[in-house]
Design a protein with these regions (language model features):
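Short N-terminal binding/cap micro-motifs at the start of the first secondary-structure element
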Residues: 54, 64-69
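C-terminal capping/extension of enzyme domains
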Residues: 1-48, 52-55, 75-77, 84-87, ...
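Short, solvent-exposed loop/turn segments at secondary-structure junctions
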Residues: 62-66, 79, 140-143, 178-182, ...
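Short, conserved active-site loops that position catalytic residues or coordinate cofactors/metal ions
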Residues: 58-65, 87
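Short, surface-exposed acidic-centric catalytic microdomains
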Residues: 67-153
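Structural motif
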Residues: 55-56, 172
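Proline-aspartate-enriched helix->loop->beta-strand connector
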Residues: 161-181
Length: 245
């Protein structure tokens, strides 16, 4: 009895073939990236410029390499701090509050104010203490980026920072960077739930002022680093102008 071709084909396909197991997928194990620690040997901390009864105290995250090298705040040429400082005319506002509108005999002011415009730069930071404008940082240690600071190091510096605020008793405390404000609040074990740029009027502010023993207006402004582009210059300048209110 002959087997028809169709039956022979079915017999071959279902009876004579062996099951072939599918190869298991190979898992690719990602190699762990090792975090390199930058060497900043030879770069010194940048000292604060703080004294009692300041009109304005600026607070940065920590000094960058250029600021450490030159020993001046916001010294990198891409940083917008001094451009915002000058265009906001904050120096003139401070002079009015100090009652120093006549600068004829003040050689430094004659250099800083030319034809009714402010021309301050990083090299003037420590000189501005003469007009009750001060500078400090959350962390005084130099790094290329604030991301290189550990959370513990940032938290450990909050008490020192608040002591400086207490000494300064500044009318306006201007924090350059939202992250600084969040660290100060985190020190109390609280996470910021709601945030708006500019002057801070909330329970967080009340706690910070109580801890520092101050009655200052606290303004939180965007970081002025050239690496931060989330807000354009005009928007940043508008927030700086609010300091004078």
């Amino acid at each position: 009895m002959s087997i028809d071709p169709a039956s022979r084909l079915r017999k071959f396909r279902y009876s004579d073939t062996k099951k072939v197991s599918k190869p298991k997928p190979v898992k690719h194990i990602k190699s762990k990236k090792t975090r390199t620690v930058a060497n900043y040997e030879g770069l010194n901390d940048l000292n604060p410029s703080v004294q009692p009864d300041l009109q304005v105290l600026f607070v940065g995250f920590n000094p960058g390499v250029e600021s450490s090298r030159t020993q001046h705040h916001y010294a990198h040429h891409t940083n917008l701090f001094w451009k915002l400082f000058n265009q906001s005319r904050l120096l003139f506002w401070v002079l009015e509050r100090n009652g120093k509108t006549n600068n004829k005999d003040d050689l430094l002011l004659n250099q800083l104010t030319i034809n009714g415009e402010s021309h301050a730069t990083a090299v003037n930071d420590f000189e501005l203490i003469k007009y009750n404008i001060g500078f400090t940082d959350l962390v005084l240690r130099c790094t290329k980026s604030a991301q290189e600071l550990t959370m513990q190091e940032k938290l450990d510096n909050v008490p020192r920072l608040l002591r400086e605020w207490n000494l300064a008793q500044a009318k306006k405390i201007v924090i350059i960077g939202k992250g600084i404000w969040e660290i100060i609040i985190k020190k109390q074990g609280i996470k910021v739930q709601r945030f708006d740029w500019g002057v801070q009027n909330n329970a967080y502010t009340q706690w910070v002022c109580s801890e520092a023993g101050i009655e200052s207006d606290i303004h939180v402004l965007p970081n002025t680093s050239g690496l931060v582009t989330s807000m354009n210059f005009a928007q940043k300048l508008a927030l700086w102008n609010e300091i004078k209110n």
